């Protein structure tokens, strides 16, 4: 299996990443940044989000495993103290695959497409925005206000909740 590691950049995360790299090589895995099948994210949720955006064009080809060394770890699978357990699972157990929906936002005015695991926000503190909102190319509504926040199920507990939005069960297929 080919793998790569994205870490948060602090000394502790780098140390955990190096330990993980050595242990994975010891069980016969190949470290390969270019053709990875598994990406290990060592840090917190922000590190995982960065890793997802780094590999956004290959999401259907790779899987992510997150190791928590950061501040927030809602998406992390293992803690930094469980690296040996992780390597054991990689070698001996069938992994449980958990899929998360990504939110795609097309911005035709600037010819850009954005993807989000948590939420997409469009906001202005300086003036009122008037937004025409479409879902799957079908007009939904016009919105006038300081902005809009659209979240996925996993993002419903983040900024959306702080904005008094509903928390959505991850098993539901809704925004």
What are these regions (language model features)?
Residues 1-42, 49-57, 79-98, 106-113:
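ATP/NTP phosphate-donor binding region
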Residues 40, 68, 120:
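A residue-level signal for conserved active-site and pocket-lining positions in enzyme catalytic cores
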Residues 141-175:
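Gly/Ser/Thr-rich active-site loops/lids in small-molecule metabolic enzymes
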Residues 55-62, 80-86, 163-173:
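A glycine- and small-aliphatic-rich helix-loop capping segment at beta-alpha/alpha-beta transitions
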Residues 72-147:
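Catalytic core of DAGKc-family lipid kinases
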Residues 44-47, 70-72, 154-157:
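Short glycine-rich anion-binding loops that position phosphate/pyrophosphate groups of nucleotides
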Residues 60-76:
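Short, acidic/small-residue loops that bind anionic groups at enzyme active sites
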Residues 35-36, 59-62, 111-112, 144-146, ...:
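Short coil/turn connectors at secondary-structure junctions
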